[in-house]
Amino acid sequence: MNQMWGSIEQYNTVVWHWPIAVYLFLAGLSAGAIISAIIIKWMKGNESSPWDGIIKAGALIAPLTIGAGLLLLIFDLTRPLHFWKLLIFYNFSSVMTLGVLALFAYFPVVLIFLLGVFKKELCDEGPFGFLAPLANIAYSMARPLEIVTFVLAIGVGAYTGFLLSAMYSYPLLNTPILPLLFLASGISAGISGNLLIGLLFFGKSTKGENVGYLHGLDFKVILFEAFLLFILFVGMYYQGGSTAEVAKAALTTGGLASLFWLGVAGMGLALPVVLNVALPHGIKHSSGFVMLNALIVLAGVMALRFYILYAGQTFVG
């Protein structure tokens, strides 16, 4: 197999380019943000207003990132003005159709969650008083709405992996581990996004115990991601034949191998773990370090999306 250097746009086997990688990142970030926000909301002491800053952060991040991701996806289509057809003509054997249906249900419920959390700012004192009935639903039916939102968010997070795993002729993508890996990394990104935005913009209402809980949860999720990546490549190697060659090439060939070892394994997985193990308790639980760690994790998750998308399409056996 020839070594490949330079821009990753040069590889003629690549049909999905960087906008898809960014979309996959934003969709996972949205799902992870709302999942971790709901987890915090369900904890004792966080069930009612005034809301913790992490809940506020998740309520903002979830609809904004999925909205931005969908716009990016639409404009990346060869014929973006025909996107509406996906909403009318369903093919239930298509992963794309099932994903669109999940997103079609997910987007409204995260908007209602946002209205419930920011009811005072948006409806009572803001310009969106006409949306107060929806905000009231978020209050009166909080737990059922949150359960539905939580389940849909898991579906959206996993769907980003299913979308790629349906590409049967690409060994690195066509694996059942990918949906779980993308869900886990999306949750990690969502936790980091909530910690970053919560501490930056809602610091006064962000409880230290909630920050500590999510920071510790993210550490566990990162270890789980590393385990999934290990299983992914070991499994491919022991399948033998061209699949083993693809696994070897993806880890050793050109700029994509560098992206994996430096961006995914190094920055995204090893660095947060080492910092959290090596640094004194006072430093690693400070707001400054938590925000820095969140930025590192977000960059690592973005690197993972780019790596899987491009390496999966480049190394095909």
UniProtKB/Swiss-Prot annotation:
Belongs to the NrfD family. It holds the Pfam family NrfD. This is Polysulfide reductase chain C. InterPro entries: Electron_transfer_protein, NrfD-like. The chain crosses the membrane at residues 20-40, 54-75, 98-118, 147-167, 182-202, 221-237, 259-279, 289-309. Keywords: Cell inner membrane, Cell membrane, Membrane, Transmembrane, Transmembrane helix. It is found in: Cell inner membrane. Functional polysulfide reductase is made up of three different (A, B, and C) subunits. One of its GO terms (cellular component) is plasma membrane. It is a multi-pass membrane protein. Could possibly serve as the membrane anchor of the enzyme. Component of the phosphorylative electron transport system with polysulfide as the terminal acceptor. Its main location: membrane.
